Structure formats: C-alpha cells, structure tokens
Amino acid sequence: MAMQYDVKSYHSTVSGVAVGYRTRLKGILISPSTAVTYNTSFCNNVNKSGTYAIAGTTTCTVTIANHGLANGDRVYLDFTSGGSAQDEAYTVANVTTNTFTVTTASLTETGNVTMYPDILVEIDCSNGTAFYTLIPGEGILAKQGIYVGIPNVAITTTLFYG
C-alpha cells in the first residue's frame, strides 16, 4: 500500500463537529491539562434530539422517539439545556421504544439532550500527560463525519483524518 498524502488534522478544545463529511479517522492526540480521569468520545456525526429528566437521584431518564437502542449500548449525550448534567459517554439501561435511562450525578433538573448513538472510539485518560493513539490499517470509517465529545475544558484533542 502506498503512502497516503491527503491526511488532514482538526484541533478542538470544545465538543462539536470536527469533520462534516464521510472520512476515515486515522489517529488522535489527546492533551489533558490535569491528572483527573476523563473520557473523550469520537462519534459518527449522526444524532437524535430529545429531553431528559433527573428527579433528585442518579437516574437520568432520556426521551427520544424511536431511538433504536438496546440495554448495554454506549451513547454520547450532549445535555444542551437544563442544568449541570455532564456531557459524556453513558451506558444505556431500561430501554423502551421511546425512553432509556443512564446513571449520572445526583441532580434535580430537566432539559434538552442530543444523543450520538454511534461512538467510533472512546479514549480514557487519567493523567496530565499528552498521548497519541494510532488507528491501524485504513482507519475507522465515519460515514457522516466526526463529532468530538469533550467532557471537560481541561482537554484538547487533535484528530487526524482522510
């Protein structure tokens, strides 16, 4: 296989769409600034919107019509309004056609949420040292682009794609 010359990069300090078209994720550089455990998600850029409610417990009920999930699935949730729920990857439980639950911090709030159900890569880090993750072969296919989910402003990422 010949060397690929059209690899590009995208640097981000906040969550958002990094690439808005079909591409392959080739590698990821993560630079945490503190030694705290973080989870950064790189998702296929397909989402569904809905609402959430947390009633003073650690159970967050998410309502999204025909979400298509099953118990045990991992999703990235971007809490777009309503309070202080943490944007990050969650494991889905108690699935019905239009609702599911995830475990969050104990809060009392409601609001809107955007779900990214197709996580391409999740990377955990627990120290303040930058590191690179090489994606082997041709990379991971992101059919609709790449959404980067950064749970904390103490992390920056650079992704390589093409």
Describe the role of every protein-language-model region.
Residues 1-22, 33, 150-162:
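C-terminal interaction-tip segments
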Residues 26-28, 139-153:
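Noncatalytic modules at the cell exterior or secretory-pathway interfaces
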Residues 35-46, 117-123, 157-162:
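Short, surface-exposed beta-strand/strand-loop-strand elements in extracellular ectodomains
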